[in-house]
């Protein structure tokens, strides 16, 4: 679920109250749940998208509203949010499971936030670099920052974006590198 921003693919920040965002999340997840059920599959997790995700990572009121909306749906869904962000505390307060997420293909600021996509180097597209970062996140719980430092990340899941030119190759390389490092990928609902 994300902001109602079709033209900007949900990546533009919008002025929406926490209550409106929670209602949008409930509507979007409810629709997706119905589609999944009609197709005979089970919806297991929910992840806010784009600007909504980024705002919820730093806006406690929004994070809490989204977490309560997920809880109110009563579908047993795992909420996915940026590791170390306001989403973690919000999920705890709402009494729902949260999968802390890290990004192997995005640059981090030293405070754990993602570097704005408007900055050069914010999206990492080199296959080997992304795979190496994924292993560092999964095995060591840390990643290099935009300014060359390191931050710790307690992540349950690693995201790679599907809209980069080599997305499929990156995803394969990440899985192969993580498995080669002795880490066995598991479904979120089994580990959170």
Where are these regions (language model features)?
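Glycine/small-residue-rich loop that forms an oxyanion/phosphate-binding "nest" at active or ligand-binding sites
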Residues: 5-48, 55
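Glycine-rich tight-turn/loop motif centered on a GG-T
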Residues: 7-22, 75, 113-125
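Catalytic beta/alpha-barrel core
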Residues: 21, 55-58, 73-83
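Flexible, glycine/charged-enriched surface loops at secondary-structure junctions
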Residues: 36-44, 142-152, 182-191
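Structural preference for beta-strand elements that scaffold enzyme active sites
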Residues: 43-47, 76-80, 97-99, 157-159, ...
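Charged helix-capping and loop-helix junction motifs
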Residues: 59-65
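C-terminal domain-boundary segment and adjacent tail
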Residues: 77, 169-192
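Active-site rim beta-loop-alpha module in soluble metabolic enzymes
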Residues: 84-142
């Amino acid at each position: 679920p994300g902001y109602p921003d079709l033209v900007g693919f949900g990546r533009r920040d919008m002025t929406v109250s926490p209550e409106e965002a929670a209602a949008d999340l409930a509507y979007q997840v409810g629709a997706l749940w119905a589609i999944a059920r009609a197709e005979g599959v089970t919806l297991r997790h929910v992840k806010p998208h784009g600007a909504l995700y980024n705002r919820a990572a730093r806006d406690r009121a929004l994070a809490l509203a989204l977490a309560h909306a997920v809880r109110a749906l009563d579908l047993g869904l795992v909420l996915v949010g940026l590791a170390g962000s306001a989403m973690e505390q919000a999920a705890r307060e709402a009494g729902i499971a949260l999968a802390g997420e890290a990004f192997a293909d995005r640059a981090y600021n030293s405070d754990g936030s993602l570097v704005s996509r408007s900055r050069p180097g914010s999206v990492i597209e080199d296959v080997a670099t992304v795979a190496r970062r994924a292993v560092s996140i999964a095995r060591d719980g840390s990643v290099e920052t935009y300014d060359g430092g390191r931050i710790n990340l307690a992540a349950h899941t690693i995201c790679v974006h599907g809209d980069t030119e080599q997305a499929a190759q990156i995803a394969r390389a990440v899985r192969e590198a993580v498995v080669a490092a002795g880490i066995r990928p598991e479904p979120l609902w089994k580990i959170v």
